[in-house]
């Protein structure tokens, strides 16, 4: 099982992504990724050209409810699978000894900084469009609470499915659970493929949710840069977007 997992990861990073063994070796262009890459950037560029009101706000009003619906479907399916309890026990059973590991704290800081966009100027950029009398402290508390609550809710569905996969393979949940790219593009697709029914539907739910989360993150990061260029150097919005 361990050997299969290593081969699976190697195949994904080397064959599909075209990853190299050195940062100085850029490798070649992956043609299977070039077209989707250009499409995504074209979508993002169109949204950014539309501005905050007609672009970002409209996209968020449409995509975020869809994201929540997709996640709800995944969670419902995840907790109803055989073996889901094992995955949830793994998720919520604390391992206090892990707090002694610096890598755990680094991962936690990295997660929270990215999740709440701390240090990216994204919150400052978005907050600048609020009315002047807005209670910023209250808004910040609501944002942090909603973000963390949604993350835990999503984790319940993910670890339910991971627990199911561990049961199917006859291994511990710890051997199946991973993080980052490996979990999203290797472990989870394998788990979805092993579902007893409606595999395609839940694959659409998962990757649809992942796409929405990714593209809204791209938009927020770019908006911080564009707003900074506009405010600091008085550059026109469309010029800054370009």
Spans of features found by a protein language model:
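Hydrophobic, membrane-inserted alpha-helices
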Residues: 41-43, 122-124, 224-226
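Short amphipathic alpha-helical surface micro-motifs
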Residues: 29, 71-72, 224-225
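Membrane-embedded translocation segments of transport machinery
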Residues: 57, 61-215, 219, 233-234, ...
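C-terminal ends of transmembrane helices
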Residues: 48-54, 128, 225
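Inter-helical loop and helix-membrane interface segments of multi-pass membrane transporters/permeases
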Residues: 1-49, 53, 85-106, 178-185
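Interfacial segments of multi-pass membrane proteins
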Residues: 228-230
């Amino acid at each position: 099982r361990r050997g299969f997992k290593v081969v699976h990861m190697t195949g994904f990073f080397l064959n599909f992504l075209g990853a190299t063994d050195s940062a100085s070796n850029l490798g070649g262009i992956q043609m299977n990724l070039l077209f989707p890459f250009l499409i995504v950037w074209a979508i993002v560029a169109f949204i950014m050209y539309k501005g905050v009101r007609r672009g970002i706000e409209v996209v968020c009003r449409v995509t975020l409810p869809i994201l929540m619906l997709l996640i709800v479907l995944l969670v419902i399916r995840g907790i109803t699978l055989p073996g889901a309890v094992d995955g949830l026990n793994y998720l919520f059973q604390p391992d206090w000894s892990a707090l002694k590991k610096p890598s755990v704290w680094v991962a936690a800081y990295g997660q929270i900084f990215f999740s709440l966009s701390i240090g990216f100027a994204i919150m400052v950029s978005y907050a600048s469009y609020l009315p002047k009398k807005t209670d910023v402290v209250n808004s910040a508390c609501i944002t942090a609470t909603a973000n963390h609550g949604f993350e835990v809710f999503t984790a319940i569905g993910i670890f339910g499915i991971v627990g199911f996969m561990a049961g199917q393979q006859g291994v511990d949940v710890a051997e199946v659970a991973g993080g980052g790219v490996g979990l999203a593009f290797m472990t989870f697709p394998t788990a979805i493929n092993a579902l007893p029914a409606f595999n395609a539907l839940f694959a659409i739910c998962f990757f649809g949710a992942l796409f929405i989360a990714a593209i809204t993150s791209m938009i927020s990061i770019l908006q911080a840069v564009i707003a900074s260029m506009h405010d600091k150097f008085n550059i026109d919005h469309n010029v800054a977007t370009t």
